[in-house]
């Protein structure tokens, strides 16, 4: 193997300051500033709706739908209803849903985490709710920065999240396999699930 080919293969990990050793990459590369070095969703952590830090490695071996949510959007009812339905029918098959409240689009998620949790309970939400975050800009959560630049996570007109209820399908290895725009209802994802569950 030529030196130039070897360098091209190792360049991403050398820029992080470490070779990608399983386990080590997650602790070294998935910090707030080093999200570009992550190889899977499992290298990130996020606060749940109750304020507890969750290591997303707990989703290893599960297929996940990751979505930004809002309680005052015109798409709220259909998305919450269909996400609850998907979770009820596929959780036993290995589907997990991670919902991240976000107030960046029309200020349609203005409440506190406690208020958002109470709102979601009205839909009988059993899937995992996380603390309110930003999904765009410098303050975007590192997971969302990472998902948007993955080969299958890129958007149609730029990578920025366009609105509430943008959804990412994540495989069992923590890799983005598809991005769904805010106009695509959760039931659209169902046809893709058998390939990954």
Swiss-Prot record:
GO MF term set: glutathione peroxidase activity; phospholipid-hydroperoxide glutathione peroxidase activity
Listed PROSITE patterns: GLUTATHIONE_PEROXID_1 (PS00460), GLUTATHIONE_PEROXID_2 (PS00763), GLUTATHIONE_PEROXID_3 (PS51355)
Reactions catalysed, as given in the entry: a hydroperoxy polyunsaturated fatty acid + 2 glutathione = a hydroxy polyunsaturated fatty acid + glutathione disulfide + H2O; 2 glutathione + H2O2 = glutathione disulfide + 2 H2O; tert-butyl hydroperoxide + 2 glutathione = tert-butanol + glutathione disulfide + H2O; cumene hydroperoxide + 2 glutathione = 2-phenylpropan-2-ol + glutathione disulfide + H2O
Record keyword Mitochondrion present: yes
EC number: 1.11.1.12, 1.11.1.9
Pfam families linked: GSHPx (PF00255)
One GO cellular component term noted in the UniProt record for this chain: mitochondrion
Source superkingdom: Eukaryota
Coiled coil: none
GO biological process terms held by the UniProt record: arachidonate metabolic process; lipoxygenase pathway; negative regulation of ferroptosis; response to oxidative stress; spermatogenesis
Active site, UniProt feature: 73
Function: Essential antioxidant peroxidase that directly reduces phospholipid hydroperoxide even if they are incorporated in membranes and lipoproteins. Can also reduce fatty acid hydroperoxide, cholesterol hydroperoxide and thymine hydroperoxide. Plays a key role in protecting cells from oxidative damage by preventing membrane lipid peroxidation. Required to prevent cells from ferroptosis, a non-apoptotic cell death resulting from an iron-dependent accumulation of lipid reactive oxygen species.
This protein's name: Phospholipid hydroperoxide glutathione peroxidase
Organism from which the protein derives: Sus scrofa (Pig)
Gene designation per UniProt: GPX4
